């Protein structure tokens, strides 16, 4: 099940936000060792606090969240314009009301085994495509690890790479995902098939390499 969260829902749906921010701390700080700000077991940054992000989450019937991502309009403050800017030699000029940035792509500790984790990742991307299509967003921009290229291909929504990071940063790319009805249909069909099949990808690849 997919849900949309916005910052004004923090007090009325505190459980969902608590699970999401705790999961981000567990994955990004504890597992991956990223230098992120964690307070009271919540991983939040200035975009969560000062901007107006939209969050997309996957949820079990029990209410437990299994995955999440964050969306920000590129006409405002984004990580690509600031934190990620020094990763790339060439300037990445993405500033459009129809292009939104996706960051904090996270498979939560409750995502499950390998098959279930890949299903969560696919459900998040399928939901992202549908949400974007319904709201007039034409492109999604994000930073991803090279290890995710094969995963995106298998899921059925591959980005167009815009730039590659400097070697000392790692093997990161800025990519642009086209939002089209065909892509959304492909994602929905692949998700349906995936629910009946075993995943060829370990959950760790999906957690470690998704959109940052």
Swiss-Prot record:
Principal EC category: transferase
Family matches, as Gene3D superfamilies: 3.40.630.30
Highest taxon above the source species: Bacteria
Any one biological process term the GO annotation gives: quorum sensing
Catalytic reaction list: a fatty acyl-[ACP] + S-adenosyl-L-methionine = an N-acyl-L-homoserine lactone + S-methyl-5'-thioadenosine + holo-[ACP] + H(+)
Keyword entries, A-Z: Autoinducer synthesis, Nodulation, Quorum sensing, S-adenosyl-L-methionine, Transferase
Pfam families from the UniProt entry: Autoind_synth
UniProt GO molecular function: N-acyl homoserine lactone synthase activity
InterPro entries recorded: Acyl_CoA_acyltransferase, Autoind_synth_CS, Autoind_synthase
The keyword Transferase appears for this protein: yes
E.C. code: 2.3.1.184
PANTHER family: ACYL-HOMOSERINE-LACTONE SYNTHASE (PTHR39322), ISOVALERYL-HOMOSERINE LACTONE SYNTHASE (PTHR39322:SF1)
Similarity annotation: Belongs to the autoinducer synthase family.
Functional description taken from the UniProt entry: Required for the synthesis of autoinducer molecules which bind to RaiR and that are involved in the restriction of nodule number.
Name of the protein: Acyl-homoserine-lactone synthase
